[in-house]
Amino acid sequence: MNLLRITIGLACSYFVFAILLNSVGTVILQAINSFDITKTQASVLEGYKDLSIAVFSFAVASFIPRVGYKFAMLVALGAVTLICLVVPSIAQFYVFKLLFAVIGCSFAIMKISVYSVIGQVTNDANKHSALLNTIEGIFMVGVLSGYWVFSSFIGSGNNSGASWLNVYYLLAGLVGIAFISVLFSPIQSPQKETLPSSQWRAFLDMLALAYKPLVLIFIISAFLYVLIEQGVGTWLPTFNNQVLKLPVDVSIQLASIFAGALAIGRLVAGQLLRFIGWYSLLIGCLIAMAGLVLLVLPLTHNIDGSQVKSVFDVPFAAYMLPLIGFFMAPLYPLLNSVMLSALAAHQQAAMTGLIVVFSALGGTTGSILTGFIFDRFSGQHAFYLTLVPICLLLASVTLFKKMTLDVSVKQVKQ
């Protein structure tokens, strides 16, 4: 019963953060329409979210166990509830910068706490993996739900007014429900004797880990992956609206296919890995991603979907582009798994901190770079740009494979 109550608290929290974190693409589109700003200006919202996650993860990772996971989660949820209530009453672009900064800082707290609590309440690897996959599965449900929640408040026109901001009252209510579920969850604080003797030492160990060649090439690979994912995911609603000329609500709903493709891709990859090696799967996925970009983007020229009324009427090319998420899906979890497995157990917490930080930096870079190219050239040019990090990933993943083999050989000899 206690495990169920804890799982509900963690799942509710991850669900609402999935909606908020992945709303940045929708908010960018609406900010362009509602506040008459450029795509380059709007793209900074991704930076406010991801850089907040990166900086705050560095700042609080070793401090959270000392104040308690439950207290930390309640603070994060309380802060997000308050900012969601503030947004509709101000209705200015700068408040969205504050919104995503608060969301980013709060998610840094939440992710560290949730992963730590899962380790507390499970006593073997299989149970840990099962609970973690359940929570991450709920996260993907939240991502999918978010597109439809926002589109229902926006309507079928371009809606340059501010009435769509009322969605944040609903979101504040959902975050409030998560707050209550965590409040009544029997989440325990870690034992004092298990905490590191020095927060500064833990921080220095994390920095020292980044100097290892294997870790460095992994960081580059993770950075490139998130650059692609956030560049595509964040700007897909705007691409649908301004390149394919689809209505705003349909543009946002159609972007949910990308999230669905990511979820399905990870489930399928889990089964395929029973039969093929991780390296072969990743190389195949990268080649398929590049092929899909080269095949689909030429089909998006001269499309006028302004008369489309629902997602069932959109042009074929509009369905195809989000499917890049299916091939993209296995990359990130597989890279993380291989990297963590190559390290000693006592180094994995520090490695997790580095993953969070450089993933956030990659997301910011991808969104800003895509927005800049989109603004100066076109949406097609911006999405063709993904071919560059895809090619770089082919090289970095190959090098990563070779280095993990070298590490395995050394461990066997020792």
List the predicted regions and their residue ranges:
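Cytoplasmic helix-loop-helix junction between adjacent transmembrane helices
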Residues: L99-G137
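Helix-loop-helix hairpin linking two adjacent transmembrane segments in secondary transporters
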Residues: F93, T134-I187
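C-terminal ends and interior cores of transmembrane alpha-helices
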Residues: G78-A91, A288-S310
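Helix-to-loop junctions at the C-terminal end of transmembrane segments
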Residues: F56-G68, G265-W278, I303-D304, F374-D375
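Helix-breaking motifs and short loop linkers at transmembrane-helix boundaries and internal kinks
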Residues: D36, G68, S89-Y94, K245, ...
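Intracellular juxtamembrane helix-capping segments at the cytosolic ends
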Residues: I109-N123, A329-A344
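Conserved MFS/SLC helix-loop-helix module at the cytosolic interface between two early adjacent transmembrane helices
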Residues: V55-Y94
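Extracytoplasmic gate region of multi-pass secondary transporters
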Residues: V24-G25, Y211-S256
